[in-house]
């Protein structure tokens, strides 16, 4: 997966899937839950657990169902060929609605130019359909359907997906314990229904990013009353990285749990790279269109025009991009407010638009043409991700006048988008110390009327280059608890360089931890099922189950094997931290056995006496380390 473009043969003939991304997870199987029609098949991952040994034969542990973003890549029954892309999930749903039309060809000038260039043949994805667009006068957004009282197939799909077979889990006893959460005003029901999904989308509190030209998509939902989602970034740059490498990063990222992926490519062949990514992506793809627009004017921000940007939006919408980051809130009057900052404007998109505004001394053309942008968005059902171009790039600049001024403008733009029934989420910081994070969330809810919040971290301190996945993971967990709907991952390479596959995985796992911690704290129904199952496996020394229930089984198994590499250690009733004689869980088990043998009903027996007797018994039995399984 490391062949550079200059050495590439025809990608439509040579491209191969990243083999690491298609390996099934140990003791896991892909399962599908069918909806009201045969073609609504919602994927989940089911983890099979070992039997707990008992004196009477064994206790069966029910399988645990977990959310699965990996798409068909981890289904052994699906043949993956990245040259042809993934299978079609949504075309029948879209056609049945009867409000779209198939175009005769691409309608963007740039798209037509790229298609006509014979030099690009060897790089081009070969199996591209003509795009769809809304019929004249039609609005094909999920918000428009929701406000008309229509429950779409996409809405039913995400309702099934969010529940993760919760009723079956309760019946199997997997949720005997779950702490009450504190949701800070979120309205999370005990069960997610299609009607609840429709209501949340109609209200603007949630979005389903689902471009009608991204038919390979497995729909998902972003909103404060649903599971906290994470986004992973990929994309080439002028410094290198091939199309195959970016597709490999995509498949690798979704394997580990990236709910959406943003293609932030800024180098050559942006158009072709994006086509390969979308055709092979089961998750929503987001972009920052101003990056490509800037490439078209050779990096000179002053030369950007509305007409060129409009063509870029149509080009990307016809490829199937699900959400656009658009920095329409960077207004001319806000730019001087950044002069006194420690780190000024750190957003690439924000700095591009600030430079354009100052060069022309005119208002941001993304702001002045916002209604026209909405017309494009609703013709393809592209969601807004309103960019925070003035986000703080250091904790010193957090919550300043420029940041919150822009946020108020984003609230104004949100209401304009909603008048067009266009789905919308709001991007947030950035670098914010812990004590100022809740103010960010509260102000966003107030200004943007509960539109989903999507933040980059935030990083809670600036002193740890190389560890900013940790500095930001702390802030991400906090703001996710307070109500943030999606967290944009940060890798260890943040501020330092382009992430490789290992960095991508580290960033995603860090953010899956933050998102899950937030779900637990909010009291999301069923959030504690996996924790309970892993804790039980840990107490019962079911090592393989501990590995397989974890977010990263490979690393857990590797760390265990560094100290205890033999297979016999997988049935040991101790770990390398405490050893056999000092394992608290082993001692607790023996105390419980003692209590049961003495017919003491309460577990709070004379612990000192119990421990002394068990210690003597351990010595008399020859300090036996293992129990037969």
From Swiss-Prot:
Region Disordered: start-end pairs: 1-30
Enzyme class: lyase
Gene Ontology biological-process entries: thiamine biosynthetic process; thiamine diphosphate biosynthetic process
A cellular component annotation (GO) from this entry: cytosol
Binding site for Zn(2+): 431, 495
Keyword entries, A-Z: 4Fe-4S, Iron, Iron-sulfur, Lyase, Metal-binding, S-adenosyl-L-methionine, Thiamine biosynthesis, Zinc
Role of this protein: Catalyzes the synthesis of the hydroxymethylpyrimidine phosphate (HMP-P) moiety of thiamine from aminoimidazole ribotide (AIR) in a radical S-adenosyl-L-methionine (SAM)-dependent reaction.
Protein name: Phosphomethylpyrimidine synthase
Organism, as annotated: Pseudomonas fluorescens (strain ATCC BAA-477 / NRRL B-23932 / Pf-5)
Co-factor binding details: Binds 1 [4Fe-4S] cluster per subunit. The cluster is coordinated with 3 cysteines and an exchangeable S-adenosyl-L-methionine.
Top-level lineage group: Bacteria
Pfam families: ThiC-associated, ThiC_Rad_SAM
Entry keyword annotation includes Iron: yes
InterPro entries named among the record's database cross-references: ThiC, ThiC-associated_dom, ThiC/Bza_core_dom, ThiC/BzaA/B
Cofactor(s) listed: [4Fe-4S] cluster
Name of the gene this protein is made from: thiC
EC number of the protein: 4.1.99.17
Binding site for substrate: 233, 262, 291, 327, 347-349, 388-391, 427, 454
Subunit comment: Homodimer.
Pathway linked to the protein: Cofactor biosynthesis; thiamine diphosphate biosynthesis
Binding site for [4Fe-4S] cluster: 575, 578, 583
Single GO molecular function: carbon-carbon lyase activity
Family: Belongs to the ThiC family.
Catalytic reaction equation(s): 5-amino-1-(5-phospho-beta-D-ribosyl)imidazole + S-adenosyl-L-methionine = 4-amino-2-methyl-5-(phosphooxymethyl)pyrimidine + CO + 5'-deoxyadenosine + formate + L-methionine + 3 H(+)
């Amino acid at each position: 997966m490391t062949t550079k473009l200059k050495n590439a043969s025809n990608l439509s003939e040579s491209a191969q899937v990243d083999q690491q991304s298609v390996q099934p997870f140990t003791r896991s199987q892909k399962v599908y839950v069918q909806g009201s029609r045969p073609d609504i098949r919602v994927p989940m991952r089911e983890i099979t657990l070992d039997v707990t040994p008992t004196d009477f034969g064994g206790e069966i542990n029910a399988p645990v169902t977990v959310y699965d973003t990996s798409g068909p890549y981890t289904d052994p029954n699906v043949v993956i060929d990245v040259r042809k892309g993934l299978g079609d999930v949504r075309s029948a749903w879209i056609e049945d609605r009867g409000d779209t039309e198939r175009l005769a060809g691409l309608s963007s000038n740039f798209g037509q130019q790229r298609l006509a260039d014979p030099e690009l043949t060897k790089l081009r994805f070969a199996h591209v359909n003509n795009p769809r667009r809304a019929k004249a006068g039609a609005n094909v957004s999920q918000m428009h359907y929701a406000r008309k009282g229509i429950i779409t197939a996409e809405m039913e799909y995400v309702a099934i997906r969010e529940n993760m077979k919760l009723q079956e889990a309760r019946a199997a006893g997997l949720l005997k314990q779950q702490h009450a959460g504190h949701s800070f005003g979120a309205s999370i029901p005990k069960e997610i229904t299609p009607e609840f999904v429709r209501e949340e989308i109609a209200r603007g509190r949630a979005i389903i990013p689902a471009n009608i030209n991204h038919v390979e998509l497995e729909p998902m939902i972003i909103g404060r009353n649903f599971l906290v989602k994470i986004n992973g970034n990929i994309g080439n740059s002028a410094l290198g990285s091939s199309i195959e490498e970016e597709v490999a990063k995509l498949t690798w990222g979704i394997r580990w749990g990236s709910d959406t992926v943003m293609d932030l490519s800024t180098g050559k062949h942006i158009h072709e790279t994006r086509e390969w990514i979308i055709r092979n992506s089961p998750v929503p793809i987001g972009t920052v269109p101003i990056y490509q627009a800037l490439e078209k004017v050779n990096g000179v921000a002053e030369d950007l025009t509305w007409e060129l940007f409009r063509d870029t939006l149509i080009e990307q919408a016809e490829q199937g991009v699900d959400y656009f980051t658009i920095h329409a809130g960077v207004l001319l009057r806000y730019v001087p407010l950044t002069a006194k900052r420690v780190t000024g404007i750190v957003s690439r998109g924000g700095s591009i638009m600030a430079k354009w505004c100052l060069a022309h001394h005119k208002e941001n053309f993304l702001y002045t043409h916002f209604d026209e942008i909405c017309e494009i968005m609703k013709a393809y059902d592209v969601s807004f991700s309103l960019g925070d171009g003035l986000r703080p790039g250091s904790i010193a600049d957090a919550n300043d006048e420029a940041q919150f001024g822009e946020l108020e403008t984003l609230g104004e733009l949100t209401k304009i988008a909603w008048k067009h029934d266009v789905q919308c989420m709001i991007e947030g910081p950035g670098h914010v110390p812990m004590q100022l994070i809740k103010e960010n969330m509260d102000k966003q809810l107030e200004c943007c009327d509960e539109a989903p919040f999507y933040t980059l971290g935030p990083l809670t301190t600036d002193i740890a280059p190389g560890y900013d996945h940790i500095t930001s993971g702390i802030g991400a967990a906090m703001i996710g608890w307070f109500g943030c709907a999606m967290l944009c991952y940060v890798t260890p390479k943040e501020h330092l360089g382009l992430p490789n596959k290992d960095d991508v995985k580290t960033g995603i796992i860090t953010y899956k931890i933050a998102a899950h911690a937030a779900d637990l704290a909010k009291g999301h129904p069923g959030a504690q099922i996996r924790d309970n199952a892993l804790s039980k496996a840990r107490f019962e020394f079911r090592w393989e189950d501990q590995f397989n229930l974890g977010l990263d089984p490979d690393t857990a198994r590797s760390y265990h094997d560094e100290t205890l590499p033999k297979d016999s250690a997988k049935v040991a009733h101790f770990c390398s931290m405490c050893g056999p004689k000092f394992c608290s869980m082993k001692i607790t088990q023996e105390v419980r056995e003692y209590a049961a043998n003495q017919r003491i009903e309460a577990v709070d027996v004379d612990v000192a006496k119990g421990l002394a007797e068990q210690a003597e018994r351990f010595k008399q039995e020859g300090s036996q380390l293992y129990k037969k399984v």
